[in-house]
Amino acid sequence: KNPLYFDPENIVRLAIEGGCNAVASTLGVLGACSRRYAHRIPFLLKFNHNEFLSYPNKFDQIFFASIRQAKDLGAVAVGATIYFGSPESSRQIVEVSEAFAAAHELGMATVLWCYLRNPAFKKDQDYHVAADLTGQANHLGVTIQADVIKQKLPENDGGYLAINTKENPYGKTDK
């Protein structure tokens, strides 16, 4: 719907012209124009993302770049998404934690897109945006040393209580 911004250089130029503090994108976009623009605007390389070709779609994030590649193209920060609560989240947590440690060793900042994905989180309301559940995801993000966390604003609370049943205990509550 916006073919002009399928061009990597146009994405970076828009960020510069718009007065953005940085531009976050993939290895392909940033790598295509890093020599020309990495000194003009900070680059944040998002090293994992979904592939959305598998059917049915699944909530998994796959590495498409390394931390070394991010550093080599002039990025000052790296970012990743973890889908907390998904069947693949344990693997994602370990992989991203290791990548963040490598980034910090190279002096780079880290950003975590911190989202919940689990069909059990939809009951009478959508608890993917519950303050208690997203708060736990944020806590895990800080634990793996994310410098910045991007999270959806809470729209409700009580996700643990709503999902927890006697037959299927879930999480930890004080009730």
Regions flagged by a language model, labelled:
Residues 2-175:
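Alpha/beta enzyme core
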